[in-house]
């Protein structure tokens, strides 16, 4: 298969222009010609964007549709069994460590996984006969922005100090742990912390974060298998559940024998950080030099010069609406597109000015007989 990855920008910085750009992007895929669609709806924070994508897929696609991590009616759903592993996390805190005062940081109220994991927390607390008051539950954002706010809520004046804070994902867990450390709390001696998802960054954090590992790679593999299997019967759908695996670590007081794995993970993350820092530096200087450009050809020359220093990039093309030199504003993409900048195998082949049908996504000169992956 050739793979086209469409990634929206979201409402970063509360900028409406990003939303307009996302809405335009979701009109770009040739829905009728796709052999399969894999959706990660939980990564789309804008409700209107989600509904826009779902509407296009339902009305225009004639292929197997797979939704990962979120239930979508009429699609093949690859879901995580939140109950079994979240129960395992709570059991571990209560049975293995004897904790009774637990707090729970879930995700947004309207998020499928957030709802499931919170219900599981409440159910298990009820089973153990443990209370959970208003200040023991906090709605986060599944990201790192609300660690301080969550700690303010859990540690409010007059509230008993929690023995453990269970978070519905790893981003929030590391944010909470960082804030607790900043305030002088020891983890796990004063307050234990756990996450969920099994991100590698939980091993590089100090202390290593207790988590539940979600088999993302296997979910991706199964998605491709379903696309293969259901080419002739896309209307037949199924729900497949995957189990997460409990990974008790230092942040709850469990000193697991993962020293070698931790070292390997930290070495890989060090190498990845070096690549990311170099990429960021190259983009920074490229942006400065591009501000000096007066023509699109000069822009192409600058990009061609810097792409040699940016690891992971081999091909690059800039595609603009037809007539971009004459018109100042466009509503959506034009039927025909122009490619004024093209870099193939790190060789600058600009200026081509090649025109191509928008539905092709990329011009023929950038395509290959070998399977390709493009990020748009």
Predicted regions and their residues:
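GAF sensory domains
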Residues: 319-376
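Short linear interaction motifs
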Residues: 20, 297-300, 368-374
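Helix-loop-beta substructure at the N-terminus of cytosolic sensory domains
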Residues: 293-333
